[in-house]
Amino acid sequence: MDATVIDELQQILPIEQLRSTHASNDYVERPPAPCKQALSSPSLIVQTHKSDWSLATMPTALPRSISQCHQLQPLPQHLSQSSISSSMSQSTTASDQRLLASITPSPSGQSIIRTQPGAGAHPKVDGALKGEAEQSVGHSSDHLFICEECGRCKCVPCTAVRPLPSCWMCNQRCLCSAESLLDYGTCLCCVKGLFYHCSTDDEDNCADEPCSCGPSSCFIRWAAMSLISLFLPCLCCYLPTRGCLHMCQQGYDSLRRPGCRCKRHTNTVCRKISSSSSPFPKAQEKSV
């Protein structure tokens, strides 16, 4: 058993001979360009030194020739393979620590930047000049045709009827408006559903307008509604509630519509563009 241990120990090369062998190995050495890059970055230096030490500590390296095997000196018998490997690992760890200590910069040498430089100050836009520019652009495109009698604009957006406000509810499934509240409050929705299922003509609009006075089966519709009102008395409140809704619509339109509301035909005046702040300035010149 002692003879086999001595033979194995004799096959292990010393570190000096491994370094000389590594220096003459063409397959392990790297080209000069990566070497320069490794010298410039500390992380690559640490990796290359660790690889060199790993190659130096490999116990499975074999001698290149028989002459190198004869040049090995016999080791004492009281040394074991575990003690040799432990001493080599300790020397490797100590050298790695010294290398890392030399590469790591001292905390006093460089200061850590914790705050980023602020962005450059942008020029502030004058609010008054911006408002005047937007106002001049708005006057140049809107309110060009002014009524000669009331002094209001006669364009289509200004003279359009303003409906009562409405909104969508339940993920845009239900329309909440004055018309829908009137239909559900007076049970007219039940009459519409009944006319829709009982109608045989697809083009018949009796389900959409059951209370209209049109010629499309007017007598039958009103007779059916009179019969249904016996079971649904709330249908009798539909016509007066409809009149109140129409009055509310007229009042809201008179307050919200900015355009001309003249009933009779009046002359149209082309307004001269000016920087006046009034929404409807007086006419400056007439159109030819």
Curated annotation (Swiss-Prot):
Expressed in the brain with expression the highest in Purkinje cell bodies and projections in the cerebellum (at protein level). Also expressed in central and peripheral nervous system ganglion cells, superior cervical ganglion and dorsal root ganglion (at protein level). Expressed in the retinal ganglion cell layer and the inner nuclear layer (at protein level). InterPro entries: Sprouty, Sprouty_domain. GO terms for biological process: negative regulation of ERK1 and ERK2 cascade; negative regulation of MAPK cascade; negative regulation of neuron projection arborization; nervous system development. The gene is Spry3. Pfam families: Sprouty. PROSITE patterns: SPR (PS51227). This is Protein sprouty homolog 3. It is found in: Cytoplasm. Belongs to the sprouty family. The keyword Cytoplasm applies. Coiled coil: none annotated. Induction: By FGF signaling. Residues 154-267 form the SPR domain. Keywords: Cytoplasm, Neurogenesis. The keyword Cytoplasm applies. Inhibits neurite branching, arbor length and neurite complexity. Inhibits EGF-mediated p42/44 ERK signaling. Negatively regulates the MAPK cascade, resulting in a reduction of extracellular matrix protein accumulation. May function as an antagonist of fibroblast growth factor (FGF) pathways and may negatively modulate respiratory organogenesis. It comes from Mus musculus (Mouse). One of its GO terms (cellular component) is membrane.
